[in-house]
């Protein structure tokens, strides 16, 4: 193994960045930023937009670093995660703890300084929900880990909304509900084609504990529920027809994937569905933003 002393600063930086799971963090922060814009009819104050974005990113990164630390032995047994620096022993436990503490402290200070105490405490609660409740308790103990633990991962829109208004109204909770319902089918399609990984690691993911057919059925059921839930922004009056059309179109494609997985499963199909689920959530929240500012202009 390459020693720490022989590594270039760029290589070391990349290793620490990998602990924050950049792609997952980017999606979470993106949803939080959308929540900021939806919270106001005008422009989000720059100090809130920048400070809130940085603060949420820092605390999210801290939570993911703790996740990597706790799961380093599990990650080492799984092909999908064996490359992580924590799994390879390239970063020590004290280093990860210090890194997470620095990120978390900086994130909390940034949110308190540039947004408000509510946003800081909600984000800290989200950190605890993911890094402690989900990672330490739910994930290794129950096949419903994704369903219950999805609550913490669904919080970013509420965090963004709170950063702007200092409150979390009903519309913000609708956005949270969308991500909450999206989470199980998103992760279950991954668990289907990575079943052996999870089985070897001893994690009670749904395909491992209840089998492939049961999981495929529940992916379909949750996707149907998701389709219905994504209509709520239009029904509540938060969004207009631009969003509605986007939600129906995007949801129809997701439903088609879920139906195909249920009727004629293949690992390749599950991989495509997993990739689409990420695109789906990104485009759905982008549609919320476009609709938010286009609606007054179009009058619909």
UniProtKB/Swiss-Prot annotation:
Please give the catalytic activity noted in the UniProt record.
heme b + (2E,6E)-farnesyl diphosphate + H2O = Fe(II)-heme o + diphosphate
- Which Gene Ontology CC terms are recorded? plasma membrane
Q: Where in the cell is it found?
A: Cell inner membrane
- EC number, UniProt record: 2.5.1.141
Under the heading CDD domains, the entry gives: PT_UbiA_Cox10
The pathway is: Porphyrin-containing compound metabolism; heme O biosynthesis; heme O from protoheme: step 1/1
**Entries under InterPro entries matching the protein:** Protohaem_IX_farnesylTrfase, UbiA_prenyltransferase, UbiA_prenylTrfase_CS, UbiA_sf
Gene Ontology terms describing biological process: heme O biosynthetic process
Membrane protein topology class: Multi-pass membrane protein
Which key words are in the record?
Cell inner membrane, Cell membrane, Heme biosynthesis, Membrane, Transferase, Transmembrane, Transmembrane helix
NCBIfam families, per this entry?
A: cyoE_ctaB, PRK04375.1-2
What is known about what this protein does?
Converts heme B (protoheme IX) to heme O by substitution of the vinyl group on carbon 2 of heme B porphyrin ring with a hydroxyethyl farnesyl side group.
Assigned protein family: Belongs to the UbiA prenyltransferase family. Protoheme IX farnesyltransferase subfamily.
HAMAP family cross-referenced by the UniProt entry: CyoE_CtaB
Additional information: Carbon 2 of the heme B porphyrin ring is defined according to the Fischer nomenclature.
Any idea what this protein is called?
A: Protoheme IX farnesyltransferase
Q: Which organism is it from?
A: Burkholderia ambifaria (strain MC40-6)
């Amino acid at each position: 193994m390459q020693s720490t002393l022989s590594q270039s600063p760029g290589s070391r930086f990349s290793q620490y960045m990998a602990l924050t799971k950049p792609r997952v963090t980017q999606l979470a922060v993106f949803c939080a930023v959308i929540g900021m814009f939806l919270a106001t009819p005008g422009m989000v104050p720059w100090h809130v937009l920048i400070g809130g974005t940085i603060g949420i990113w820092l605390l999210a990164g801290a939570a993911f670093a703790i996740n990597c630390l706790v799961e380093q032995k599990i990650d080492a047994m799984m092909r999908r995660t064996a490359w992580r620096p924590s799994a390879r022993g390239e970063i020590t436990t004290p280093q990860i703890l210090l890194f997470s503490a620095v990120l978390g402290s900086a994130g909390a200070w940034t949110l308190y300084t540039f947004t408000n105490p509510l946003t800081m405490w909600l984000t800290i609660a989200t950190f605890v929900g993911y890094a402690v409740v989900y990672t330490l308790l739910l994930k290794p103990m129950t096949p419903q880990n994704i369903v219950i633990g999805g609550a913490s991962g669904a919080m970013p829109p509420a965090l963004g909304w709170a950063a702007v208004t200092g409150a979390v109204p009903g519309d913000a909770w609708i956005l949270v509900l969308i991500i909450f319902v999206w989470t199980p089918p998103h992760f279950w399609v991954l668990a289907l084609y990575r079943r052996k990984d999870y089985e070897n690691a001893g994690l009670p993911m749904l395909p491992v504990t209840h089998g492939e057919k049961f999981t495929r059925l529940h992916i379909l059921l949750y996707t149907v529920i998701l389709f219905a839930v994504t209509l709520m922004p239009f029904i509540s009056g938060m969004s207009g027809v631009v969003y509605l059309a986007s939600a129906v179109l995007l949801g129809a494609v997701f439903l088609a994937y879920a139906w195909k997985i249920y009727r004629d499963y293949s690992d390749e199909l599950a991989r495509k569905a997993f990739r689409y689920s990420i695109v789906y959530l990104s485009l759905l929240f982008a549609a919320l933003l476009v609709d938010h500012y286009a609606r007054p202009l179009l009058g619909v």
